[in-house]
């Protein structure tokens, strides 16, 4: 018989996830259907989103472990007997790590906050770039562009590699940069074979009791990555995406009536935007993994 969620101590709530303690060395990592944008948790939820994030992370944790020797925090299978029935398919048993205070961001293309930095300074996170780059320009080599980990409701801030050295030391910073770029390159190469460009992505790493750096949190999900369709990619324009950029675009468009820079929270998402977002997340998972989402464990919303 599986335990109930109430059997575990609730430790923390994030924008999307809930964290529980299983025992002295293991945590239960639960992905909800909440969606955030521009540092706000939206009133609307995306049905099955938590299951998609979990399924995608499980696929990539396994793929990266096999193909790039990237170790991770998983401490059991998706149907681990310690996972309560009510969160099966959207929860994982993970090893408790000492998390690094840095968002490990890898960028293969110029967009988002990187584009804003470049337009203002000609650099991204202190890295000088050639002139003449535009929206969606591809870099010759992926960039490691770290950011601070902001508190809930605050903005992540891009920082330089020297800032990372100041936070975690030179040796660990170099290891983090190398691991981030290796992980991104391997995962992005796989996605490209499935017709998807991973423009950028955000990883989180922690250190285990033996001092080993491990990939944690989520990996290559539509929440943590920008997914573009490879078949209609064109430099200099906003790309068609499979990720939550679709929601961001609606929020900042004329139909929402919301001022991103005002003091009001975002409005609820219309049903058609909710449905389209769910469909995009599922399509991203199925295209990249080659698996059917209907076969993933847990009860569909």
Curated annotation (Swiss-Prot):
EC number: 6.3.2.6
SUPFAM superfamilies in the cross-refs: SAICAR synthase-like
One GO cellular component term: cytoplasm
InterPro entries in alphabetical order: SAICAR_synt/ADE2_N, SAICAR_synth, SAICAR_synthetase_CS
Keywords: ATP-binding, Ligase, Nucleotide-binding, Purine biosynthesis
Record Pfam families: SAICAR_synt (PF01259)
Catalytic activity: 5-amino-1-(5-phospho-D-ribosyl)imidazole-4-carboxylate + L-aspartate + ATP = (2S)-2-[5-amino-1-(5-phospho-beta-D-ribosyl)imidazole-4-carboxamido]succinate + ADP + phosphate + 2 H(+)
Membrane-spanning intervals of the chain: none
Pathway: Purine metabolism; IMP biosynthesis via de novo pathway; 5-amino-1-(5-phospho-D-ribosyl)imidazole-4-carboxamide from 5-amino-1-(5-phospho-D-ribosyl)imidazole-4-carboxylate: step 1/2
MF GO annotations: ATP binding; phosphoribosylaminoimidazolesuccinocarboxamide synthase activity
BP GO terms, sorted: 'de novo' IMP biosynthetic process
Organism: Mycolicibacterium vanbaalenii (strain DSM 7251 / JCM 13017 / BCRC 16820 / KCTC 9966 / NRRL B-24157 / PYR-1)
CDD domains reported for this sequence: SAICAR_synt_Sc
Protein name (database record): Phosphoribosylaminoimidazole-succinocarboxamide synthase
Family per record: Belongs to the SAICAR synthetase family.
Gene field: purC
């Amino acid at each position: 018989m599986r335990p109930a969620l109430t059997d575990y101590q609730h430790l923390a709530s994030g924008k999307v996830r809930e964290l529980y303690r299983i025992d002295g060395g293991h945590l239960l990592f639960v992905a909800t259907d909440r969606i955030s944008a521009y540092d706000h948790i939206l009133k609307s939820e995306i049905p099955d989103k938590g299951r998609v994030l979990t399924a995608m992370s499980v696929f990539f944790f396994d793929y990266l472990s096999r193909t790039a020797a990237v170790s991770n925090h998983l401490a059991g299978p998706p149907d681990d007997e310690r996972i309560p029935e009510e969160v099966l398919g959207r929860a994982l048993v993970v090893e408790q790590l000492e998390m690094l205070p840095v968002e490990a961001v890898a960028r293969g293309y110029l967009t988002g906050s990187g584009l804003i930095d470049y337009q203002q300074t000609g650099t991204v996170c202190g890295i000088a770039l050639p002139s003449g780059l535009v929206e969606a320009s591809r870099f010759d080599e992926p960039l490691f562009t770290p950011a601070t980990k902001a508190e809930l409701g605050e903005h992540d801030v891009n920082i330089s590699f020297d800032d990372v050295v100041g936070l975690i030391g030179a040796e660990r910073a170099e290891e983090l940069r190398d691991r981030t770029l290796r992980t991104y390159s391997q995962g992005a190469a796989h996605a490209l074979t499935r017709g998807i460009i991973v423009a950028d992505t955000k990883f989180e790493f922690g250190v285990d009791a033996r001092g080993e750096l491990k990939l944690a949190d989520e990996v290559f999900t539509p929440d943590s990555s920008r997914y573009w369709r490879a078949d209609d990619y064109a430099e200099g324009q906003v790309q068609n995406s499979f990720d939550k950029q679709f929601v961001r675009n609606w929020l900042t468009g004329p139909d929402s009536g919301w001022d991103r820079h005002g003091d009001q929270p975002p409005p609820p998402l219309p049903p058609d935007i909710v449905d389209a977002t769910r469909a995009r997340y599922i399509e991203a998972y199925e295209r990249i993994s080659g698996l059917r989402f209907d076969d993933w464990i847990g009860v569909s919303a």
